[in-house]
């Protein structure tokens, strides 16, 4: 039987774990933790240790209001959900931790892909990640979690994400060539019109917010 232990991690240790985890993402970093702490949310960095090594982790949030207290793990926890023993231990510990905090419920948003598809929406072969992660979903259900279902449309948590495979692409020319003809035309047209990309400074964030709002109103979302 494997020996696990729940530990509290430093922000630095958590960032290091997240940076090397297959499902690591911005929501599971100390930067996101500082942002949420600034909003008055209680933040903790929890991890599972096995044989001296951190094998799972979570930026654990406790939200408190006059009406209720609840716990959230955005885009996590970071865990190998196909490892049933590890998943059962970590989720059980997190549920107990949430209960000790007085939470009425705990919401998690695992970042692990359920099933990989090609650019046309078809499922990839099983050896390329196309096999649905039904076992992982069932493990979480058996632990008391309720799955929100495979929704579509603009939701707070997008069910579908598109990632560009950059394997074999070494420069801008080969990247452009990897897209279809219509996309190539759009990119070349934007370049001919003087459109370019640059990083905004913090003093320009309102410009981004205004553009985002205008786009939302124009696109009706």
Functional labels for PLM-detected ranges:
Residues 1-9, 56, 136-221:
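Acyltransferase donor/substrate-recognition loop-hinge adjacent to the catalytic core
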Residues 13-16, 89, 93, 207, ...:
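Alpha-helical elements of Rossmann-like donor-binding domains used by nucleotide-donor carbohydrate transfer enzymes
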Residues 34-128:
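Conserved donor-binding loop and adjoining core beta-sheet/short helix segment
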Residues 6-51, 58:
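N-terminal charged segments
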Residues 18-21, 94-98, 140, 190, ...:
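Hydrophobic, Leu/Ile/Phe/Ala-enriched alpha-helical segments that form helix-helix packing faces
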Residues 113-150:
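Conserved active-site alpha-helix within GNAT-family acetyltransferase domains
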